[in-house]
Amino acid sequence: LQPAGALFSYKASEDDPTEISFAKGDVLQIVDSSGKWWQAQRSNGELGIVPSNYLRLI
């Protein structure tokens, strides 16, 4: 896992249950960084996909 900091807040689409929301400044653990959508885990254990351009690897 690689940590990434959120540059912006993101609200997951209600139409896509695989997306997760996060707030600016949150630190997510990146599980898979291939492609434009990364698989990430929040500190509460929630796992899902996030837009990579909203994050910066730490």
Residue ranges and their predicted role:
Residues 1-58:
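Src homology 3 (SH3)-mediated interaction modules
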